[in-house]
Amino acid sequence: MRNSWLGAGVFAAGLGLAMILACGGLSSAGPAATASPAFWKVWGDGKAELSGYAITTTRYGVPREGRVVLIYVTEPMDRRNWIKDDAGDVPIEERVNVLKLNNVLKFQTGIYPYSVMTSVFAPVDTLAAERFAPAKIAMGAQEWCGLVYEKVIPAPQAFTSELRSYFHAEGDRDATVKTPPGTLYEDALLIQLRELDGPFARGKSWAGSIVPSLWSQRKGHTALGPVAATIKREDATRDGLPVTRFTLSYGSVVTTYDVEKAAPRRVLGWKTSGGDEAKLLKTTRLPYWQLNAPGDEKYLKELE
């Protein structure tokens, strides 16, 4: 992973966004607005923000204790395939700067562990109705029975999905699912609700369609598709800190997210009607991809 080029030079890359076509949920008219200098002052520093959480999550009808790490970092991607521009040689008109979120969940079920990672790639410039609309979402889940991988590519009025599963009933499946204009994706809310470069839903409550998280659909073995939803916002406090509380509701599902009002506007925790509850432990900024030498395990203490 290389992010050292980000910074002042990143504004030049934004010029290429005007040539983006209507794919991956992005507007063919190019960016309505580019990310602000204040955004890049934080997110162009060549580091990632890492936040560790303690979580209780329900699996097989039983509460399980686990850990979540949310990893936020900016990086360049090739819009032609939504793969990272590792070599730095993608033509500028094809390069899109994204804020990537890796949501890593680990917990134990009896003898065997679960490891789930969901990656969200959200262009930092305004290319859709809502800021940080995802261009790509991918989820991988591993446990001793086998593994599952699913990828979703949003488009303005549909999304395409690829599912690769060890379950015979699912197997390998590709699909295109229609979505109403302005559809949100639950997996991207942990970026969007932080309001890192402007208010979510213009600072108001929201109503529309949302695609539930890939992991929630994985657990329920249900088809992925848009559902009617609302997101209510209100002022609240959490452990004495002022927060914006967002309440997502669709069907019988209710999830609340508490986002601190002060910078860096971290997600202090969330709670679901299904029994999940996460609480922030610590946050740090590190170039984690460089910390792979023996002894670098010490940095894990910055997340506990």
What are these regions (language model features)?
Residues 1-4:
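Positively charged n-region of N-terminal signal peptides that target proteins for export
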Residues 30-162, 198-304:
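Acidic, serine/threonine-rich low-complexity disordered tracts
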